[in-house]
Amino acid sequence: MQSMKAMTLLTSSAFMMMAAMVVALITNFAGLFPGDVLDAGLRSNLTILTLVVMLTLSMSRIPLQNLNPLKYGKSMARAIFLGMIVASIIPLVGYLLLKDTEYAAQAAGLVFIAATPFAGSVLPLSIILRGDAEHAARGTIVIYILSLVWIPFIVWLMLGDSVDMEFLVITVLELIGVPLILSRLLAKLEINKEILAAFLNCCIFFMVWLSVGATNFSGNAWWIFLVFVIIAVLRSFGLGTAVEVTEKRIGIHWGQRVTDILMTSYKNKGVAIALCVALYPPGMVAIATSILIEITWVAFMDSVLFSKKRMERELAAEGESVS
């Protein structure tokens, strides 16, 4: 019974992210993070390695099919528009408003959030929540391939020469290009879904602790944290609920709404962390603050927006049954 309870907690993204943030903040503010052992270079390498393993495993569950742009162009365009363009607007505007202040370095983290693709877990969440799984799978592959160009472009456009672009391109190829290739080698390997979910959540826990636990929050005025919180709330809660209200009003069914909301509001913070730790460490202040809000957003989606009762009611109204 206890092992079942433990597995339930380990497979809960909301619980593991919340636990990771609590442990990371306690470690940070209590001065317990072993920074003398886990220096910046080692943290960067560990973050990149962990993320490569995570993305390789998660992408190996995504089939390379239904990718014909002539047949599925509308679906691909929707994923690109919502998952890349719309999802990037608020953090980019936030950075532009802050780039000429004394906290420009910390605000640079918003650029990495903007450049980051949506989370790889959009597909499994779409399956669980009766979203459009085919669209989620297709969109994930397309977005991650385009991210090989999109991430360097956005970072170059916003941060220019302040970032080593050659190192950025190499890091992006390591983070996303390598998993895209390696994942095909594992595509036919049978992996227990619960064990995979628990392992990926443990990786997320480690990455959040490693990055947030080491982030230097001291010396920053209270108002900059408030600004980062507001930007994060608008980017997750604001965009997510806006997509829900807009699409429901124009008659789009539950399945498409679920996946569209996830693509728009649920960023892959692991990629943002890995890039920022490797290229622009001061920007971790903005990312750490954003993670705290995104954890709350995940819990809200799980318990309210995509609750089982609401899902059953919506699908019943659309003439579908919940098995």
Give short role names for the model-derived ranges.
Residues M1-S323:
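Alpha-helical transmembrane segments of multi-pass small-molecule/ion transporters
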